[in-house]
Structures are given as structure tokens and as C-alpha cells.
Amino acid sequence: MKYINVAALTVGLAGAAPAKQPSAFEGLVSKTAEEVSGFEVQVLGGMTLRAPQVYNTNFIQMKRGPRAYVQSLRKYSAFGATIPPNLLQIIDEILGELGLGDLLGDGIGAGAGEVAAVPQMFDSEYLAAVQIGTPPQDVTLNFDTGSSDLWVFSSDTPATQVNGQKIYTPGQSSTSKALNGASWTITYGDGSGASGIVYTDVVTVGGVSVPNQAVEAATKVAGSFSQDAASSGLLGLAMDSINTVKPQAQKTFFSNAMAGLAMPLFTANLKQGEPGNYNFGFVDQTEFTGNINFVPVNASQGFWAFQSEGFSVGNGQAQNFPHQAIADTGTTLMLVADEMAEAYYAQVPSAQNNAQVGGFVFDCSEELPSLTANIGGYQAVIPGSIIKFAPADTDSFDTAKTCFGGIQGNTGLPFAIYGDIFLKAAFTVFDGGNMRIGFAAKSGQ
């Protein structure tokens, strides 16, 4: 049974709550999950917001598996992730077939609410509507719990690098102010990235506005970003410590909004092949079943990192395999230690790590086993249907014989990346007020 306090969830709309109310989380923590100090969340008022996702209609379907793998690895190149040369060659060949050239190399040297997100084909990216400025300017951003910059295509971006994206124009906002002397740079190991200058302005998500939010306006972007016409940039939701603005790092949208939210948290309810959503300031009891199981967050490297004790494949025996993992909505795949990936695919008779394709592949006709992650005693089950990520030999599951797996090796990273493959299977609570993360089974799954 769930013990959500409905009054606490709606207090932002109804007015101030009594000085003392039961925590909205009472009864939600599993007895087997490690409890966190300062468990009770005081609900004294504030806002809530819902941010639904929207479809990226410009997504290119062709050979999505290796492309998603490269994007996942390059994001964490600073932490030791390496992109195998054969995989880069595969990407160059794909881009050549698409007539896009070598895009990987042209680098740069308070409230509660809900935002909805809709996936690209094969769920490679989730986008959500955001408004910036006064009057509000609409942009569509990728909500990313694995980074901490809010950056956008803007009127400062060279026209040759804008390819149909909605842009932010500071000069048309009465609340925009230049943050003099501030700059930002995001660079990946393959040389791609973006950089620019910084403004402060009103940012609105799901009807909740944050004034004086740092908005990083791109003055240079790599071609790999420019080709995605539906995405205007990123809204980072990791820790402030890894924001790239110099000389002084800036706070994320969530950090600035947190004090005004009914609860100092947000949730991610990502789905397979249909719109999901992010909720800020409240927990929607209709989106999960059973208990929410919390474990502490290790924020030392700026991420929503937590301990996973092990895993099991299908109905097989549980394996003791302790490792740090990062919950990252901005990474498509689930990247784990090579031993863990190999142990999973060892239970898939047709699976092979195919250098010509760029990762683990298998016969599309094969029914994949589930993968269960043991997190603080909670068993998070990822169905095999989600792990069957994309066709590898054609552009459609209807005609494909070989499929690309959603679980791949992390090429030496000191932690695993629990990206969208994992998050589509687990309702996730990012509790910034208590520095913990919670997981629960999704409703209807």
C-alpha cells in the first residue's frame, strides 16, 4: 500500500499548509533499503510542476544502436570512457551514407510542476518544452540528469550552425541580462561540443518560473548538435559542482527552484515508445506501485551516483557485483562493466560482441531475458523487451534480423551509467533535499 499524502502534493495550489504535516514519504521507504539521515520531508507550501515530453520529429533512424553507443561514451570521455576506433569508423560510414559528413570531428576546440517528454525513434532522446524570457520564448530541451548546464541555440549562434532549431533571443526579452565576463564550454573526447556566453533570465518549466536563471547561449556548436533540428539544447539536472560556466559555476534550474517547491525533489517517469514526464515538487502516486526504495547519493563527482550491489539475469542466481552507478536521463543506453555485459549476453544464445556493428547484437527473433539490478535490497527489473534497443541491419524492427542491445560495456569507466534503458523500467525520485535517490516499480508495467 502507498502512503502518499494528497494534501501535501497539492498544497502549492491550495495555499499554505499547516506548520506541521506528516511527511509525504512516510511509509514509502522499503525496510530492506538503506535509510538516509534526515528522512522526514517537511511540506510547508510551495509549487509543483509537470513537464511532459514531446516527440523529436527530426530523428534519423538509420543504425541507431552504434550512434547511441558513441554518444553515450563520448559524454563520459573525461572519466576514462574510450570510443573504440572501429566504432568511430562505423559512425563515419553511417554519416557518409546520410550525406552528413564527419560530424563527430567538427568540434569547438519555486513551485511544483510536471514536464512531459516524448522520445525520438528508438527512444534515443527525450525532449521537453521550456520557456525563456519575458515575454516567454519557446524552446525544446533535453532534460539531462547527467550534466549541469542549461545551454541553448540562440541569436548569438552563427546562422550557419543553426539548422531549424528554436532559438533564444536575449534582445527580445525584457528580463534578460548579460553575465559579463562569463563563458562556458562543453567538450567531448572526440572533439565535438559547444561553447558560448551567459545571460540570466526567467526560465519557465511546466508553468513554474525561476528568475535570474543562468542561460548559456551558444556562440559555437559542433555539427553533431546542429543536425538535431528539434532540440534547442540541454537543461542539466545534475549537481551545481559540474556546471561549466567560468569564472564562477552557476546553479541548475532545479537548484534555483528547489526552495520554492512543495517538496525539494523531482521525478522521472520515462517510457518506451510513448511520452513520459518529469514532475517537480511532488510525487504522483499513480505513476508507481509498491514502495519507493531510497538509497544515499554520492555527489562527490557531481552526479546522481549510488551503489548497486549486484544483478541477476532472467531467473538465474543473483550475482554479487558491487559498483557505483549514475542515473542519467541524458544517456540512451545502460553502460555497465564489461564483465556484467558479458554475463548478461551469455544467457542470449545468438548474442555476440560484433566489432563490425559496434557492440553486442543478437537475433531479433530471440526473446531476451530480463536484467535485475539489486539496489539497496530493491530489485529493479529491466524487461528484455526494453533491452532490445534497435535494429542493427535495417531501419525497422519489421524487417531486421539482427538487433542492437540496450546494455553495452562501459569501456573502462569507474562507474556504470544507468541511462534510459534502466530508467524506462524504474520510476525514479531525485530527492535533492535529502541527497538520495529512490526507485519503484512503474504502474502498468
In which residue ranges do the predicted regions lie?
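Signature of the N-terminal lobe/flap region of pepsin-like aspartyl proteases
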Residues: G105-V115, Q120-Q213, A217-T219, L368, ...
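Aspartic protease catalytic domain
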Residues: A17-P52, F59-M62, V70, S77, ...
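Solvent-exposed loop/turn segments at secondary-structure junctions
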Residues: T145-L150, D156-A159, G193, K220-G223, ...
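Aspartyl protease active-site motif detector
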Residues: Y126-Q172, V203, A230, L234-A238, ...
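Flexible, small-/acidic-enriched active-site or ligand-binding loops
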Residues: N277-P322
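Short strand-coil-strand connectors
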Residues: V130-Q137, T204-P211, A262-P264, G314-Q319, ...
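Disordered propeptide/prodomain
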Residues: K2-V139, V295
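Glycine-rich flap/beta-hairpin and adjacent strands of clan AA aspartyl proteases
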Residues: P211-T289, K388-G444
